[in-house]
């Protein structure tokens, strides 16, 4: 197994200010699935329509428990005949695969986490122009995934154009790095996390797994749920919430300012979000999914909040020192 690639980290930068950057995605992993039953198996478990998934596109998807609560979210796509794959957070991969295998006893499908696959993000100024020096064809809004001999490229349009590369040979990565060294910056997965937060892509950790329905974390907005396909795990609860209007939670990104000279603890997944009531009391209204420090003195926090909250409101995060005046917006 290759050692996981991790570039030296620095403070993440908002997409509008991001120079051309290579980003190591050491917090994500690739999972391969192959066998004659692979399409039907995933179709019966994931929220998206696997049977009608275009081979030139990937889809956002959620894997849920029988109650419709999301175990994890992922990108799923075709690799080649009778082989599919998905990308998800590394720290939830083991749990998610174990849950998936419970319903695969009679399916002819093999599931293999591919820890040798190298995942790299490329984002920032002129990312497409730079990649075009190495690849004759790049993915776009119409064809969101492209396969070459040693690299698969995924296109993401939000918050600005960026690319996710699945590299099968270390020598290919070395070549890209050697040829790009003078033109790019490097960062670790925190930069990709911040871009996902800007884009409204939920980041589910083990502690927040199985807490939310997919609609509470934008999976319907991201076209990660099909309401026209046949039965899948959790479908009854997910459909009921859509058609009866029961979704009382939604995804937000909070913005806060901190004194970078002090030794703060960033909000952590699972921390509680509280709303100030009548300028004196605090009420629990949500849960933290993820946070990151932007540049030196800004904090972004991805949270799930009750829909009943009015904007703007004064919020704080419990169990941390960074809990004052976090104003929320989409």
Curated annotation (Swiss-Prot):
SUPFAM superfamilies (UniProt xref): Aminomethyltransferase beta-barrel domain, Folate-binding domain
Disulfide bonds: none
Organism annotation: Blochmanniella pennsylvanica (strain BPEN)
Principal localisation: cytoplasm
Key word S-adenosyl-L-methionine present: no
Source taxon at top rank: Bacteria
Intracellular or extracellular location(s): Cytoplasm
Protein known as: tRNA-modifying protein YgfZ
